[in-house]
Amino acid sequence: MGVKDLLSRKTGVIVGDDVLRLFQHAQENVFAIPAIMVTSSSTGSALEAARDKSPIVLQTSNGAAYFAGKGKGVSNDGQSVAGSIAIAAAHYIRSQAPAYGIPVVLHTDHCAKKLLPWLDGMLDADECYSKLHNEPLFSSHMIDLSEESVEWNIETTAKYLKRAAPMKQWLEMEIGITGGEEDGVNNESVDNNSLYTQPEDIYTIYKTLSAISPYFSIAAGFGNVHGVYRGDIALRPLLRHLHNAKYDEQLKCLQDPLGFFVFHGGSGSSHQPATSITSEFAAKGRVDLEKVAYLPGTSSLVIAPKDYLMSPYGIPVVLHTDHCKYFDPRVQIREGLKHMSARVQEAKDDFNDSNQAKKLLPW
């Protein structure tokens, strides 16, 4: 089936039923869509890697949005800075994405209890945008109440899904603990046994949320950890099958009964676990790249010509030569972006996402 039969919008930011169809297609064809964290010019490097070939998720976190806007010197009370910058990023991505010939899911990441005002503000923007364009500004949002009780997590997530549902907007929720540290939630010291979500929680989430809307996914704990693994983390994607098998009789459903799963912690995982996760359950895999992939590129333009960088007038041997080109931050940043783009390609290969758009786009 070609993408003309699958998606109503062929390129650019997709929403609603197109997001649902894309994730369904990923499940049926055993690939996961890489979700790439972007901050600024990293948006272009992610799109560059996927150009004409692969669907992609572009997402920003509260921390990244605040970082991009904190230079304004204004208070972030009520998440005003993080909210306004995330909204600005959404408009920027919407303007750029169609040029790359691929479907793009526009997403915001995490959002703990203390950051809910950020989500509230973005939903306000979604509703305003929807009145004008009959679709939300963002394709999807995430709510991460994994630090709270399971009951409050599910109850609050359901409330937000009810708000998003009329816009056919996707909501990703986290249940259980993802190790490491991300966006102000620190689970670096938790016991490994705490990194696995219980089947009964998944079942309760599915029953509760599916009664409201089909536009949701679950970021469950399968031993995954944010950041670079140290070799002592055991990913257990087969737990997904145990979740489904335990409740298959109650649901009596021939299709995947427990919805769509998201794999967090893809940045530091080796290729084999990431590929295994994809083949077992994930329709989306989150990869936080800008922290890891920028450095090799930018540092190569600092370490190698370090003598030139000591003075804009050149090294002592060539006193009258202008070496200002070595100081151009655009050159350094571009080298970092090239490395990031290559890392995005690795993630697409790991998640079996490479050339999926070409498979979907036969023209």
UniProtKB/Swiss-Prot annotation:
GO terms of biological process kind: gluconeogenesis; glycolytic process
Cofactor: Zn(2+)
Highest rank taxon of the organism: Eukaryota
Pathway entry: Carbohydrate degradation; glycolysis; D-glyceraldehyde 3-phosphate and glycerone phosphate from D-glucose: step 4/4
Chain residues that bind D-glyceraldehyde 3-phosphate: 61
GO molecular function terms attached to this record: fructose-bisphosphate aldolase activity; zinc ion binding
Binding site for Zn(2+) 1: 110, 226, 264
Induction note: Only detected in the mycelia phase, but not in yeast cells.
Pfam family, one: F_bP_aldolase
Binding annotation for dihydroxyacetone phosphate: 227, 265-267
Reaction(s) this enzyme catalyzes, per UniProt: beta-D-fructose 1,6-bisphosphate = D-glyceraldehyde 3-phosphate + dihydroxyacetone phosphate
Enzyme class per UniProt: lyase
Cofactor annotation comment: Binds 2 Zn(2+) ions per subunit. One is catalytic and the other provides a structural contribution.
UniProt keyword annotation of Calcium present: no
Oligomer status and interactors: Homodimer.
Family in the record: Belongs to the class II fructose-bisphosphate aldolase family.
Free-text function comment from the UniProt entry: Catalyzes the aldol condensation of dihydroxyacetone phosphate (DHAP or glycerone-phosphate) with glyceraldehyde 3-phosphate (G3P) to form fructose 1,6-bisphosphate (FBP) in gluconeogenesis and the reverse reaction in glycolysis.
Protein name: Fructose-bisphosphate aldolase 2
Organism annotation: Paracoccidioides lutzii (strain ATCC MYA-826 / Pb01) (Paracoccidioides brasiliensis)
Taxonomic lineage from the root: Eukaryota, Fungi, Dikarya, Ascomycota, Pezizomycotina
Gene: FBA2
